[in-house]
Amino acid sequence: MESLTLQPIARVDGTINLPGSKSVSNRALLLAALAHGKTVLTNLLDSDDVRHMLNALTGLGVSYTLSADRTRCEIIGNGGPLHAEGALELFLGNAGTAMRPLAAALCLGSNDIVLTGEPRMKERPIGHLVDALRLGGAKITYLEQENYPPLRLQGGFTGGNVDVDGSVSSQFLTALLMTAPLAPEDTVIRIKGDLVSKPYIDITLNLMKTFGVEIENQHYQQFVVKGGQSYQSPGTYLVEGDASSASYFLAAAAIKGGTVKVTGIGRNSMQGDIRFADVLEKMGATICWGDDYISCTRGELNAIDMDMNHIPDAAMTIATAALFAKGTTTLRNIYNWRVKETDRLFAMATELRKVGAEVEEGHDYIRITPPEKLNFAEIATYNDHRMAMCFSLVALSDTPVTILDPKCTAKTFPDYFEQLARISQAA
């Protein structure tokens, strides 16, 4: 297996122009495909997950042109639901941001489409979404294991009263929200359980509004969506920088700054993961907010005990930053780490122990006490981009770290290690 050894980093300083947000890129691509008119998306993320969405749109007959660097995309909207000519199979890799929204959107009208993906995708639950779509009339068949992809979709979603469990993934609700306006009837979506990752729902609502559709949000408990609507192209749309990707550089500055400035997001960003900067500030770093940037300057870091349900992806970065904080850090209410690219609670606990941390792994929490000195270790990444990026922070000690399968960052940030090297000074 390929590996990358990072030598100790003495200091980080500089500016990072963030790649586009994965969450925003894939939502914007789907809405642009469903909309009337031509949409030009700029600062689109070029990564595995986005390529899977683009490949699916090609399979569905959507025409678009990409710039040479794949960050500008011109899409000719379909002016309504997407249809396949005859039976079709779409392979979506391990891209939850493609699988979940497409599973819903392709239930409009009459299709015969199979959605499948990598082995890990077949372990990521989708039952709550399928249950909700079936309540709205959709005809969906599990082809292998009940409640997991691959799925066969045969249309039929017309709207009506739909319940969805919000406790596992907010992407199920996102998928329903984006699909419901195009259904013939009105849809009332009721949320069962506690809604996780609520800020991601705000991204969805924000984008839908950009494409001309507003819905009634009743305190995130119930959503009322008028049927028979259509999305309208906004003309051009700039994709925000990826706030989850920003977390690694901001944390690096908190540990070994200097000052690092990330551009492409700022105080008015729609992504909940910008709140990660508040967590670093609480730990002792200095944060400065602009309209189009966030900067972080080193501080003496202290441990925290926090509910991280609102920023689950960025919270992983706090788990490795905790290695540099004084005291024991506890991250709570993060059960949904277990259903991501890998079981992130298990993976994080296992790898933190390798570098010498004392770790308690609970059902939905992790408690981390750093060692006096970090051990040199080979870090397994579990084909999870965030594991690779989080553990790069270990090099901010006086100990090198080896990252196995470093190219797994291609899911969201193909040139992550080059960007980190650009702001790093060797010890």
From Swiss-Prot:
<feature type="binding site">
    <location>
        <position position="344"/>
    </location>
    <ligand>
        <name>phosphoenolpyruvate</name>
    </ligand>
</feature>
<feature type="active site" description="Proton acceptor">
    <location>
        <position position="313"/>
    </location>
</feature>
<comment type="subunit">
    <text>Monomer.</text>
</comment>
<comment type="similarity">
    <text>Belongs to the EPSP synthase family.</text>
</comment>
<dbReference type="GO" id="GO:0008652">
    <property type="term" value="P:amino acid biosynthetic process"/>
</dbReference>
<dbReference type="InterPro" id="IPR013792">
    <property type="entry name" value="RNA3'P_cycl/enolpyr_Trfase_a/b"/>
</dbReference>
<dbReference type="Pfam" id="PF00275">
    <property type="entry name" value="EPSP_synthase"/>
</dbReference>
<dbReference type="GO" id="GO:0005737">
    <property type="term" value="C:cytoplasm"/>
</dbReference>
<feature type="binding site">
    <location>
        <position position="411"/>
    </location>
    <ligand>
        <name>phosphoenolpyruvate</name>
    </ligand>
</feature>
<feature type="binding site">
    <location>
        <position position="340"/>
    </location>
    <ligand>
        <name>3-phosphoshikimate</name>
    </ligand>
</feature>
<keyword id="KW-0808">Transferase</keyword>
<dbReference type="GO" id="GO:0009423">
    <property type="term" value="P:chorismate biosynthetic process"/>
</dbReference>
<feature type="binding site">
    <location>
        <position position="313"/>
    </location>
    <ligand>
        <name>3-phosphoshikimate</name>
    </ligand>
</feature>
<feature type="binding site">
    <location>
        <position position="336"/>
    </location>
    <ligand>
        <name>3-phosphoshikimate</name>
    </ligand>
</feature>
<keyword id="KW-0963">Cytoplasm</keyword>
<feature type="binding site">
    <location>
        <position position="22"/>
    </location>
    <ligand>
        <name>3-phosphoshikimate</name>
    </ligand>
</feature>
<feature type="binding site">
    <location>
        <position position="124"/>
    </location>
    <ligand>
        <name>phosphoenolpyruvate</name>
    </ligand>
</feature>
<feature type="binding site">
    <location>
        <position position="22"/>
    </location>
    <ligand>
        <name>phosphoenolpyruvate</name>
    </ligand>
</feature>
<feature type="binding site">
    <location>
        <position position="170"/>
    </location>
    <ligand>
        <name>3-phosphoshikimate</name>
    </ligand>
</feature>
<dbReference type="InterPro" id="IPR036968">
    <property type="entry name" value="Enolpyruvate_Tfrase_sf"/>
</dbReference>
<feature type="binding site">
    <location>
        <position position="23"/>
    </location>
    <ligand>
        <name>3-phosphoshikimate</name>
    </ligand>
</feature>
<feature type="binding site">
    <location>
        <position position="171"/>
    </location>
    <ligand>
        <name>3-phosphoshikimate</name>
    </ligand>
</feature>
<keyword id="KW-0057">Aromatic amino acid biosynthesis</keyword>
<dbReference type="GO" id="GO:0009073">
    <property type="term" value="P:aromatic amino acid family biosynthetic process"/>
</dbReference>
<feature type="binding site">
    <location>
        <position position="169"/>
    </location>
    <ligand>
        <name>3-phosphoshikimate</name>
    </ligand>
</feature>
<keyword id="KW-0028">Amino-acid biosynthesis</keyword>
<feature type="binding site">
    <location>
        <position position="171"/>
    </location>
    <ligand>
        <name>phosphoenolpyruvate</name>
    </ligand>
</feature>
<protein>
    <recommendedName>
        <fullName>3-phosphoshikimate 1-carboxyvinyltransferase</fullName>
        <ecNumber>2.5.1.19</ecNumber>
    </recommendedName>
</protein>
<feature type="binding site">
    <location>
        <position position="197"/>
    </location>
    <ligand>
        <name>3-phosphoshikimate</name>
    </ligand>
</feature>
<dbReference type="InterPro" id="IPR023193">
    <property type="entry name" value="EPSP_synthase_CS"/>
</dbReference>
<feature type="binding site">
    <location>
        <position position="96"/>
    </location>
    <ligand>
        <name>phosphoenolpyruvate</name>
    </ligand>
</feature>
<comment type="function">
    <text>Catalyzes the transfer of the enolpyruvyl moiety of phosphoenolpyruvate (PEP) to the 5-hydroxyl of shikimate-3-phosphate (S3P) to produce enolpyruvyl shikimate-3-phosphate and inorganic phosphate.</text>
</comment>
<feature type="binding site">
    <location>
        <position position="27"/>
    </location>
    <ligand>
        <name>3-phosphoshikimate</name>
    </ligand>
</feature>
<feature type="binding site">
    <location>
        <position position="386"/>
    </location>
    <ligand>
        <name>phosphoenolpyruvate</name>
    </ligand>
</feature>
<dbReference type="GO" id="GO:0003866">
    <property type="term" value="F:3-phosphoshikimate 1-carboxyvinyltransferase activity"/>
</dbReference>
<comment type="pathway">
    <text>Metabolic intermediate biosynthesis; chorismate biosynthesis; chorismate from D-erythrose 4-phosphate and phosphoenolpyruvate: step 6/7.</text>
</comment>
<dbReference type="InterPro" id="IPR001986">
    <property type="entry name" value="Enolpyruvate_Tfrase_dom"/>
</dbReference>
<dbReference type="InterPro" id="IPR006264">
    <property type="entry name" value="EPSP_synthase"/>
</dbReference>
